[in-house]
């Protein structure tokens, strides 16, 4: 299980900019990098179109999501997680997030009106330590 998520200040700023640019709707994307033991290292946050374009949910564009997985693999990387925003609420998983996390075994980074937090699903939602590098 992932216990730590290391992400650059640059990628944190990119996700925050996505939150602001897409308000009041949720924005989303993928986190590309590597996993070393229980630490996921984000090398790139890649915005992906939210095909739902709503205030309370997101759905990654399937073609862009596939291309991100494909491109990451070609470069010896993985999609280590996904991110999405809660532009008018806190950075905690919603009921929909929790139900979806159970079937999406990766890190979920949520940027909310009150900051940014990371989570994984392991017999329930678990907090992942977010480390800015």
Segments from the language model and where they lie:
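Conserved beta-strand-loop surface patch within small alpha/beta domains used
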Residues: 1-79, 87-133
């Amino acid at each position: 299980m992932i216990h730590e998520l290391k992400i650059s200040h640059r990628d944190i700023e990119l996700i925050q900019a996505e939150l602001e640019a897409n308000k009041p709707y949720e924005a989303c994307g993928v986190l590309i990098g590597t996993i070393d033991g229980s630490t996921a290292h984000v090398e790139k946050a890649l915005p992906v179109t939210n095909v739902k374009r709503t205030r309370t949910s997101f759905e990654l564009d399937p073609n862009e999501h596939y291309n991100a997985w494909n491109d990451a693999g070609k470069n010896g990387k993985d999609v280590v997680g996904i991110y999405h925003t809660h532009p008018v609420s806190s950075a905690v998983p919603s009921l929909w997030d929790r139900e979806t996390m159970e079937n999406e075994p990766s890190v979920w980074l949520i940027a909310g009106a009150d900051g940014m937090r990371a989570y994984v699903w392991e017999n329930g939602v678990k907090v992942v330590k977010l480390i800015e590098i």
